[in-house]
């Protein structure tokens, strides 16, 4: 895959255009402030009763309702939760889009699964920073940026790709590198990673390790330290230098034990289940299940949240984290 940098992007494709950022959460505040400080004309679209209105105004941003922001804008970036985008698109975005406008996203879920089907007269693009919003913002203020993905779903004006690259540049992304992909590939890999590794797989691995030690008679505190707390040390090594950096940094005992016992935990059967999970993402079964869950009032999700919050690892973890003065309590 090719990477694009500063010389490959031209902010001129966004200059003189009105840009609306819908949402002012983690990504929304970073997009709005970075683009504004890159010299672009930005407003934020929010519900009138949103708690984010005051924060956005205090940051020097113009704030409108979603409908007003879209009507004013040439380019609209939708940074709202996936489950709310369809309804807001149908009631407040679509009626106010004009031919030649650009509709932008930071994640492809609603476009890829046809929850949102824009008119062919508008550009549809994606700019997806591969970092949380606070890091997108912080690196920009330091004169750097984070890697970004871009994609084009519809090019009505012939400038969609150039606009996506320019947006990434406005965020600071071209200083790190921008990779072009598709809505399909971004969406499917993102969902799979969350489910099988980042949020689903890792959480279940942690709980299983904790339970194994506790059921064998070891104190919950030690089980927490070994299976939850110390994971950050290892993940930081992965983050900085991959698997090799981790293996180089740990003891020979840990390296040998991990290499010989790890495959007994993540067996071919686990990988086979991962493939099933990927298939559910690819064929839309997961998307339908999630949409039905949202429409049904989150009954299953709320039950699962309650079960997880009541797990023993959460109770002992809360006590142990109180001992860690360096942690910011939330």
From Swiss-Prot:
Its EC number is 1.1.1.86. The keyword Zinc does not apply. One of its GO terms (molecular function) is magnesium ion binding. GO terms for biological process: isoleucine biosynthetic process; L-valine biosynthetic process. Pathway: Amino-acid biosynthesis; L-isoleucine biosynthesis; L-isoleucine from 2-oxobutanoate: step 2/4; Amino-acid biosynthesis; L-valine biosynthesis; L-valine from pyruvate: step 2/4. Mg(2+) 1 binds at residues 190, 194. SUPFAM superfamilies: 6-phosphogluconate dehydrogenase C-terminal domain-like, NAD(P)-binding Rossmann-fold domains. Substrate binds at residue 251. Residues 182-327 form the KARI C-terminal knotted domain. It comes from the Bacteria. Binds 2 magnesium ions per subunit. Involved in the biosynthesis of branched-chain amino acids (BCAA). Catalyzes an alkyl-migration followed by a ketol-acid reduction of (S)-2-acetolactate (S2AL) to yield (R)-2,3-dihydroxy-isovalerate. In the isomerase reaction, S2AL is rearranged via a Mg-dependent methyl migration to produce 3-hydroxy-3-methyl-2-ketobutyrate (HMKB). In the reductase reaction, this 2-ketoacid undergoes a metal-dependent reduction by NADPH to yield (R)-2,3-dihydroxy-isovalerate. This is Ketol-acid reductoisomerase (NADP(+)). It comes from Chlorobium limicola (strain DSM 245 / NBRC 103803 / 6330). The gene is ilvC.
């Amino acid at each position: 895959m090719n990477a694009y940098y500063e010389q490959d992007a031209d902010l001129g494709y966004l200059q003189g255009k009105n840009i609306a950022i819908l949402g002012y959460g983690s990504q929304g505040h970073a997009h709005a402030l970075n683009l504004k400080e890159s010299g672009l004309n930005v407003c934020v679209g929010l519900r009138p009763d949103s708690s984010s209105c005051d924060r956005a105004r205090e940051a020097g941003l113009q704030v409108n309702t979603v409908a007003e922001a879209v009507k004013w804008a040439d380019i609209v970036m939708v940074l709202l939760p996936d489950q709310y985008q369809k309804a807001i698109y149908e009631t407040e975005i679509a009626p106010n889009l004009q031919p030649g406008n650009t509709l932008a996203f930071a994640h492809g879920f609603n476009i890829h699964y046809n929850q949102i089907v824009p008119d062919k007269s508008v550009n549809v693009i994606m700019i997806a920073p591969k970092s949380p919003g606070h890091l997108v913002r912080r690196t920009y203020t330091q004169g750097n940026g984070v890697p970004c993905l871009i994609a084009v779903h519809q090019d009505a004006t012939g400038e969609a790709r150039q606009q996506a690259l320019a947006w990434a540049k406005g965020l600071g992304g071209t200083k790190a590198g921008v990779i072009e992909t598709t809505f399909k590939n971004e969406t499917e890999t993102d969902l799979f990673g969350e489910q099988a590794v980042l949020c689903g797989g890792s959480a279940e691995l942690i709980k299983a390790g904790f339970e194994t030690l506790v059921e064998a008679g070891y104190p919950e505190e030690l089980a927490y330290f070994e299976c939850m707390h110390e994971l950050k040390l290892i993940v930081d090594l992965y983050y900085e230098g991959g698997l090799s950096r981790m293996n180089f940094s740990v003891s020979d005992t840990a390296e040998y034990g991990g290499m010989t016992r790890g495959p007994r935990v993540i067996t071919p059967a686990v990988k086979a289940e991962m493939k099933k999970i990927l298939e559910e993402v690819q064929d839309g079964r997961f998307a339908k299940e999630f949409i039905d869950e949202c429409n049904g009032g989150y009954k299953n999700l709320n039950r699962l949240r309650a079960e997880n919050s009541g797990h023993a690892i959460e109770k002992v973890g809360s006590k142990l984290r109180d001992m860690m003065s360096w942690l910011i309590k939330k």
